[in-house]
């Protein structure tokens, strides 16, 4: 379960500090489930429904049936040769050096929670916007040349927080990972930096393995 406001320190925290954050999430989730099951302020029908749920008996048996790791939806991202933004996935969707086509909508979770009074709050930051197919350019997976010349980043790619929501799915990461492998072999073979490979040749190799680069090919 999301805990708006508590996620911000994670990326910069030590392992010990992350354990504290993890415990906060566990305590919050445990408390919320107990509240929904037992508190008289909760409608009786909802309490009855929630009373039917419990922890999975055959999972994480050595950890009180809780997952060992906190699910991290997003944390650090590279600032690369090109930063993919909300505009790139909504309006300026065509890119000359395209290496893959994204299509997922923007589904940003709540970022902050504000208390209105003793019984009410407002969540902020939620975006649920249907998108369109958009080009993902090569610069999104390459670092700035002055910082590194032999690195390709298909997962923690160079995107804004909003654009990251649209490429964070495994099918997209799988294709970007495959593209990274192709680009890496070209860089090694040509003894060049990853920024200096021939993107047109890369595109031909991408298409040769069955990854479409034109939206009409989907």
What are the functions of these language-model segments?
Residues 1-218:
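Flavin (FAD/FMN)-binding glycine-rich loop and adjacent Rossmann-like elements that form
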């Amino acid at each position: 379960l999301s805990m708006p406001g508590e996620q911000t320190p994670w990326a910069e925290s030590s392992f010990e500090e992350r354990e504290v954050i993890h415990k906060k999430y566990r305590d919050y989730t445990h408390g919320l489930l107990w509240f929904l099951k037992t508190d008289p302020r909760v409608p009786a029908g909802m309490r009855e429904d929630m009373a039917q749920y419990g922890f999975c008996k055959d999972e994480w048996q050595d950890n009180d049936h809780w997952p060992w790791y906190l699910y991290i939806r997003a944390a650090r991202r590279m600032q690369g040769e090109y930063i993919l933004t909300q505009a790139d996935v909504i309006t300026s969707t065509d890119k000359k050096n395209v290496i893959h086509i994204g299509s997922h909508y923007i589904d940003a979770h709540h970022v902050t929670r504000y208390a209105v009074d003793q019984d009410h709050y407002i969540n902020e930051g939620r975006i649920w916007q249907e998108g369109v197919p958009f080009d993902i350019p090569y610069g999104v997976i390459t670092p700035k040349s002055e910082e590194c010349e032999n690195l390709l980043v298909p997962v923690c790619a160079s995107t804004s927080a909003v654009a990251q929501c649209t490429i964070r799915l495994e099918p997209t990461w799988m294709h970007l990972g495959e593209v990274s492998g192709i680009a890496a072999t070209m860089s090694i073979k040509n003894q060049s930096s990853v920024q200096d490979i021939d993107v047109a040749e890369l595109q031909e190799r991408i298409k040769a393995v069955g990854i479409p680069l034109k939206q009409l090919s989907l």
